[in-house]
Regions:
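N-terminal pro-sequences and low-complexity stem/linker regions of secreted or lumenal proteins
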Residues: 19-509
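N-terminal export signals
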Residues: 1-17
Length: 509
């Protein structure tokens, strides 16, 4: 075990500021319309004693949405105003057949079009690397047109506050991160493996490398076969309480064919149903067990809450059903003030789902240990790409806690391993498998909290319902077995701007 508080405080990239957080990333545009408002609060990496105020850490990881796709129009973030005044830059994506030769981001207007849900588009390892194009970020439209056909254009679609009122209200009330990345330039499974173990076994030493998602999910032939260490095992060995709350249909060993976002199913040490490790990984359901534990004051130190298919936001599942699910998690935490006062909830997305984001992620240099595939030959589905593994594209991250109240924007660079490092910093349980490079370029999420500013006021949040008549009419109940009509690219999308207003940011330490 590590001394609690030492690793994260030393490894944090910066306080939540708009300048330091971009060090080492793609060059900023010559000019930017993103305004930074006056500083009204100061925070640095908290001490171990301060962080001890957090007794419950809750991770909610939804599916397949990029930062620009959800929050590109949100005020003050690095979003759609992040381009030179005299051009559209990377926002104008080359595409054959377009009148101007390029396509701009366009609004998926849920009020007037059938945009409440759109079909799934490719987000596998090879197409994502082609969209990245060595950091040029100019392959989004061409790659998706080639792979996804009539559905490909939706890569450039985005939602606004009118479409996502609950999520925008959470950002207004708490803290949003605009430099949080998924871990892998690829799909669900490798990213979720990083979120629980900080690796996808690129050297193939323990069952990997895992670079794509295997259907059905998790694949029956790969269930309980992976041999590397996960964080829950470390927590178990250290005596730190933890649980996974999953879809009740998957909270048994039987696991009829279907889907779960709980990737602990892949790891061999969880196979024995008589062990506490297995029970904590697969024995608890959402919402019933989660509600019971919160209301009884027995919520463990670390929790993972996984949504079931249809409400996890994986296209064609609707964002609105995801909002309803997340609102249930938040409302449950708020229902017990004693638990809420000691809780930090982190809401993010496993990967971008093929949706456009304009910020080129920082990636490891060639030859970086643990950050490229070293098996030979490469997996057949690698498309010839051995590297980079990551960082991946930006995805949303909302930090919901009485210590994150106030509508802050945090621009420190994070990825999914930052969630593990938050646990490491708070509880002294070392993250397994984390590369030295990734530890050096990402923070541990402690700077998203101001532990000197406990705010127990309950924010006013809109009602989020999974019974919205538009969603019921347009969207399938199960995202995997159904599709929806193609969403066409509008004929003349115009470059948009962000919401008016400035960002509140914590000052640099």
């Amino acid at each position: 075990m590590l001394a609690a508080g030492l690793v994260g405080a030393a490894g944090a990239v910066a306080a939540c500021s708009s300048t330091k957080a971009r060090t080492g990333a793609a060059p900023a545009p010559t000019t930017t319309k993103v305004a930074v408002g006056p500083t009204t609060s100061t925070t640095c990496s908290p001490s171990a004693g301060q962080l001890g105020q957090i007794e419950h850490v809750v991770f909610v990881i939804q599916e397949n949405r990029s930062f620009d796709h959800y929050f590109g129009t949100y005020r003050g973030v690095r979003g759609f105003d992040d381009h030179a005044a005299n051009g559209n830059g990377v926002f104008a994506q080359p595409i054959p057949g377009a009148p101007s030769g390029a396509v701009l981001p366009f609004h998926l207007d849920t009020a007037t079009t059938n945009a409440a849900c759109t079909n799934d588009i490719t987000h596998d390892w090879a197409p994502q690397h082609r969209a990245f194009n060595n950091g040029a970020m100019d392959g989004w439209a061409t790659v998706h047109a080639a792979v996804d056909g009539a559905d490909g254009g939706v890569t450039m679609g985005y939602y606004t506050r009118a479409d996502l009122p609950y999520y925008y209200a959470l950002a207004d009330a708490f803290t949003i991160c605009d430099a949080y990345h998924c871990s892998v330039i690829g799909p669900t499974d490798p990213n979720r493996m990083f979120s629980i173990s900080a690796t996808n076994d690129p050297a193939g030493l323990a069952g990997g490398p895992f670079i794509n998602t295997v259907d059905p999910i998790p694949s029956a032939k790969l269930r309980f076969t992976m041999g590397w260490t996960t964080l829950p095992e470390r927590l178990q060995n250290a005596g730190v309480s933890w649980k996974v709350y999953d879809n009740p249909a998957f909270a048994t060993l039987v696991l009829a064919p279907g889907i779960s976002n709980n990737k602990l199913y892949y790891f061999k040490r969880y196979a024995d149903p008589t062990t506490e490790l297995h029970q904590r990984a697969f024995g608890y359901g959402f919402p019933n067990d989660f509600v019971k534990d919160v209301q009884s004051g027995t919520l463990p130190s670390v929790s993972w809450v996984f949504a079931s298919p249809g409400i996890d936001e994986h296209p064609p599942a609707s964002p609105q059903r995801g909002e309803a699910f997340v609102s249930q998690v938040v409302a449950t935490l708020l229902s017990n003030p004693a638990v809420w006062a000691k809780t930090a909830m982190f809401l993010t997305y496993d990967e971008n789902g093929g949706f456009f984001d304009h910020v080129a992620p920082l990636v490891s240099p060639p030859g970086t240990p643990g950050e490229e595939l070293t098996v030979s030959p490469l997996p057949s589905d690698a498309g010839g790409f051995a590297r980079p593994i990551g960082l991946g594209f930006r995805v949303p991250m909302l930090v919901v806690s009485p210590f994150s109240r106030g509508g802050w924007v945090c621009s420190d660079r994070f990825d999914h391993t930052s969630m593990l490092r938050f646990v490491e910093t708070r509880f002294g349980v070392e993250v397994p498998n984390l590369s030295a490079w990734r530890r050096s370029v990402t923070g541990d999420l402690t700077t998203t909290l101001d532990l000197s500013a406990l705010d127990l006021s309950v924010p006013t949040l809109p009602v989020a319902s999974d019974a919205d008549p538009v969603v019921v009419r347009e969207c399938p109940a199960h995202e995997v077995i159904q599709t929806v009509p193609h969403y066409p690219i509008p004929p003349n999308p115009a470059m948009l701007t962000q919401e008016a207003g400035t960002a509140k940011r914590h000052s640099t330490c």
